[in-house]
Amino acid sequence: MVDELVLLLHALLMRHRALSIENSQLMEQLRLLVCERASLLRQVRPPSCPVPFPETFNGESSRLPEFIVQTASYMLVNENRFCNDAMKVAFLISLLTGEAEEWVVPYIEMDSPILGDYRAFLDEMKQCFGWDDDEDDDDDEEEDDY
């Protein structure tokens, strides 16, 4: 029984060494590929973006629709950079200044789930900075009453 355990332990140690060596080789290959990729990327000139970089948003309610359109357009043409909701929200946050930046700090401090949900983050911004999507619907209903 003890001999079997010793043999098993020896076999496991040998397997561990072999896997460690293989892992080291793979990590070296990965390092070389990352360096090669960086070198190739420096040689390639990225195409110019047809949509300008969005302006910052300071919390001024009248600018919120413009800010959302600018950022959405920019993210659409650069979709490879914004592959998930967390990246989109982080991009929006990077453009906030003043009152808007102060507004987002508590969400960051408590690591709110809203930071990983683009739609929810936009809805929260709209609610805070005074953009109501239902405004047009209410106007239509009032017109129907007359």
Swiss-Prot record:
Keyword field: Nucleus
GO cellular component: nucleus
Subcellular location: Nucleus
Biological-process GO terms, alphabetical: cellular response to lipopolysaccharide; cellular response to muramyl dipeptide
One Pfam family it belongs to: DUF4939
Subunit composition and interactions: Interacts with NOD2.
Reported function: May have an important role in the development and/or progression of some cancers.
Family: Belongs to the LDOC1 family.
The protein's name: Protein LDOC1
Lineage: Eukaryota, Metazoa, Chordata, Craniata, Vertebrata
